[in-house]
Protein backbone atom coordinates (compact mmCIF):
# COMPACT_ATOMS: atom_id res chain seq x y z
CA UNK A 1 0.00 0.00 0.00
CA UNK A 2 1.14 3.53 -0.74
CA UNK A 3 2.37 5.91 1.94
CA UNK A 4 0.20 8.83 3.01
CA UNK A 5 2.52 11.45 1.42
CA UNK A 6 2.63 9.58 -1.91
CA UNK A 7 -1.17 9.19 -1.91
CA UNK A 8 -1.59 12.89 -1.21
CA UNK A 9 0.84 13.67 -4.03
CA UNK A 10 -1.11 11.48 -6.51
CA UNK A 11 -4.37 13.13 -5.44
CA UNK A 12 -2.83 16.58 -5.80
CA UNK A 13 -1.57 15.69 -9.31
CA UNK A 14 -4.95 14.23 -10.34
CA UNK A 15 -6.72 17.24 -8.92
CA UNK A 16 -10.16 17.04 -7.44
CA UNK A 17 -12.92 19.29 -6.26
CA UNK A 18 -16.46 18.03 -5.77
CA UNK A 19 -18.75 19.91 -8.15
CA UNK A 20 -21.84 18.67 -6.27
CA UNK A 21 -23.35 17.54 -9.55
CA UNK A 22 -24.75 14.33 -8.02
CA UNK A 23 -23.55 12.16 -10.92
CA UNK A 24 -21.88 9.68 -8.56
CA UNK A 25 -25.24 9.25 -6.79
CA UNK A 26 -27.09 8.26 -9.96
CA UNK A 27 -26.97 4.93 -11.74
CA UNK A 28 -25.17 5.33 -15.05
CA UNK A 29 -24.78 1.58 -15.60
CA UNK A 30 -26.21 -1.36 -13.63
CA UNK A 31 -25.07 -1.15 -10.00
CA UNK A 32 -22.87 1.90 -10.56
CA UNK A 33 -24.41 3.75 -7.62
CA UNK A 34 -24.41 0.94 -5.06
CA UNK A 35 -23.11 2.42 -1.82
CA UNK A 36 -21.89 -0.27 0.57
CA UNK A 37 -22.42 0.74 4.18
CA UNK A 38 -21.43 -0.75 7.51
CA UNK A 39 -23.47 -0.84 10.69
CA UNK A 40 -21.68 2.20 12.16
CA UNK A 41 -22.45 4.26 9.06
CA UNK A 42 -26.10 3.17 9.10
CA UNK A 43 -26.34 4.07 12.80
CA UNK A 44 -24.90 7.54 12.11
CA UNK A 45 -27.46 8.08 9.34
CA UNK A 46 -30.28 6.81 11.60
CA UNK A 47 -29.30 9.29 14.31
CA UNK A 48 -28.96 12.16 11.84
CA UNK A 49 -32.23 11.52 9.96
CA UNK A 50 -34.49 9.75 12.45
CA UNK A 51 -35.10 7.05 9.83
CA UNK A 52 -35.18 3.34 10.62
CA UNK A 53 -32.53 0.84 9.52
CA UNK A 54 -34.87 -0.51 6.82
CA UNK A 55 -35.58 2.96 5.47
CA UNK A 56 -31.85 3.55 5.02
CA UNK A 57 -30.33 0.27 3.94
CA UNK A 58 -31.17 -2.89 2.07
CA UNK A 59 -29.22 -6.11 1.54
CA UNK A 60 -26.51 -6.08 -1.11
CA UNK A 61 -28.43 -7.30 -4.19
CA UNK A 62 -26.13 -10.12 -5.32
CA UNK A 63 -27.23 -13.22 -3.44
CA UNK A 64 -25.32 -16.46 -3.15
CA UNK A 65 -27.41 -19.60 -3.46
CA UNK A 66 -25.66 -22.83 -2.41
CA UNK A 67 -28.00 -25.74 -1.79
CA UNK A 68 -30.29 -24.63 1.07
CA UNK A 69 -28.14 -21.56 1.79
CA UNK A 70 -29.26 -18.12 0.59
CA UNK A 71 -27.03 -15.25 1.69
CA UNK A 72 -25.41 -11.99 0.72
CA UNK A 73 -22.64 -9.88 2.21
CA UNK A 74 -23.46 -6.50 3.68
CA UNK A 75 -25.78 -3.60 3.12
CA UNK A 76 -26.21 -0.82 0.58
CA UNK A 77 -27.99 2.50 0.82
CA UNK A 78 -31.53 2.25 -0.53
CA UNK A 79 -32.13 3.71 -3.95
CA UNK A 80 -35.17 5.34 -5.46
CA UNK A 81 -35.28 4.62 -9.16
CA UNK A 82 -31.85 5.37 -10.58
CA UNK A 83 -30.58 7.43 -7.65
CA UNK A 84 -29.54 7.26 -4.03
CA UNK A 85 -32.57 7.87 -1.82
CA UNK A 86 -30.67 10.70 -0.13
CA UNK A 87 -29.99 12.65 -3.33
CA UNK A 88 -32.24 15.71 -3.54
CA UNK A 89 -31.82 17.33 -6.97
CA UNK A 90 -28.00 17.46 -6.87
CA UNK A 91 -27.36 17.75 -3.13
CA UNK A 92 -26.89 15.07 -0.49
CA UNK A 93 -29.40 15.17 2.37
CA UNK A 94 -26.98 13.32 4.66
CA UNK A 95 -23.78 15.12 3.63
CA UNK A 96 -22.42 15.59 7.20
CA UNK A 97 -22.74 11.83 7.90
CA UNK A 98 -22.32 10.45 4.38
CA UNK A 99 -20.66 7.02 4.18
CA UNK A 100 -16.90 6.57 3.70
CA UNK A 101 -17.32 5.57 0.07
CA UNK A 102 -19.11 8.87 -0.64
CA UNK A 103 -16.55 10.94 1.28
CA UNK A 104 -13.64 9.50 -0.66
CA UNK A 105 -15.13 9.19 -4.15
CA UNK A 106 -13.67 9.15 -6.83
CA UNK A 107 -10.66 7.69 -5.03
CA UNK A 108 -10.45 4.06 -3.96
CA UNK A 109 -7.54 2.40 -2.20
CA UNK A 110 -7.12 -1.36 -2.27
CA UNK A 111 -4.30 -3.89 -2.16
CA UNK A 112 -3.32 -2.84 -5.72
CA UNK A 113 -3.00 0.83 -4.84
CA UNK A 114 -5.00 3.95 -5.67
CA UNK A 115 -7.73 3.90 -8.32
CA UNK A 116 -9.32 7.12 -9.54
CA UNK A 117 -12.79 6.64 -11.02
CA UNK A 118 -14.05 8.90 -13.81
CA UNK A 119 -15.58 12.04 -12.33
CA UNK A 120 -16.24 15.58 -13.57
CA UNK A 121 -14.48 16.89 -10.45
CA UNK A 122 -11.08 15.41 -11.31
CA UNK A 123 -8.62 17.79 -12.91
CA UNK A 124 -9.78 20.61 -10.63
CA UNK A 125 -7.35 22.38 -8.33
CA UNK A 126 -6.93 20.73 -4.95
CA UNK A 127 -4.98 22.35 -2.15
CA UNK A 128 -2.21 20.43 -0.43
CA UNK A 129 -4.16 20.34 2.85
CA UNK A 130 -7.23 19.03 1.02
CA UNK A 131 -5.17 16.36 -0.76
CA UNK A 132 -3.74 15.22 2.57
CA UNK A 133 -7.23 15.12 4.14
CA UNK A 134 -8.55 13.03 1.24
CA UNK A 135 -5.52 10.70 1.54
CA UNK A 136 -6.14 10.29 5.29
CA UNK A 137 -9.82 9.53 4.67
CA UNK A 138 -8.93 7.00 1.98
CA UNK A 139 -6.52 5.24 4.36
CA UNK A 140 -9.12 5.23 7.15
CA UNK A 141 -11.73 3.85 4.76
CA UNK A 142 -9.34 1.12 3.62
CA UNK A 143 -8.59 0.12 7.23
CA UNK A 144 -12.32 0.14 8.08
CA UNK A 145 -13.15 -2.05 5.08
CA UNK A 146 -10.34 -4.48 5.91
CA UNK A 147 -11.59 -4.77 9.49
CA UNK A 148 -15.17 -5.34 8.31
CA UNK A 149 -14.07 -7.92 5.73
CA UNK A 150 -12.07 -9.87 8.31
CA UNK A 151 -15.05 -10.02 10.67
CA UNK A 152 -17.23 -11.30 7.82
CA UNK A 153 -14.62 -13.93 6.84
CA UNK A 154 -14.53 -15.14 10.45
CA UNK A 155 -18.31 -15.56 10.45
CA UNK A 156 -18.22 -17.48 7.17
CA UNK A 157 -15.37 -19.70 8.44
CA UNK A 158 -17.41 -20.52 11.53
CA UNK A 159 -19.85 -22.43 9.32
CA UNK A 160 -22.90 -21.03 11.10
CA UNK A 161 -24.82 -19.78 8.06
CA UNK A 162 -28.39 -21.01 8.60
CA UNK A 163 -30.09 -23.02 5.88
CA UNK A 164 -33.59 -22.48 4.58
CA UNK A 165 -33.89 -18.71 4.92
CA UNK A 166 -32.23 -15.69 3.30
CA UNK A 167 -29.64 -13.92 5.47
CA UNK A 168 -27.23 -11.02 5.32
CA UNK A 169 -23.75 -11.55 6.70
CA UNK A 170 -22.11 -8.35 7.90
CA UNK A 171 -19.38 -7.51 10.41
CA UNK A 172 -21.94 -7.61 13.23
CA UNK A 173 -23.15 -11.14 12.47
CA UNK A 174 -25.91 -12.91 10.56
CA UNK A 175 -29.27 -11.21 10.07
CA UNK A 176 -32.48 -12.51 8.52
CA UNK A 177 -34.02 -10.62 5.65
CA UNK A 178 -37.04 -11.20 3.53
CA UNK A 179 -35.52 -11.49 0.08
What is each stretch, according to the model?
Residues 1-179:
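Short loop/turn segments that flank or connect secondary-structure elements
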Amino acid sequence: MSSLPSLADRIRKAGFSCLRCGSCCRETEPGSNLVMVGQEEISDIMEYTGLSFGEIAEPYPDRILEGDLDYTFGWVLRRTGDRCRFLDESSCQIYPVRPWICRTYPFVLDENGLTIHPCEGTGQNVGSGDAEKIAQDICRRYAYEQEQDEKIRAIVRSGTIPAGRPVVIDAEGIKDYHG
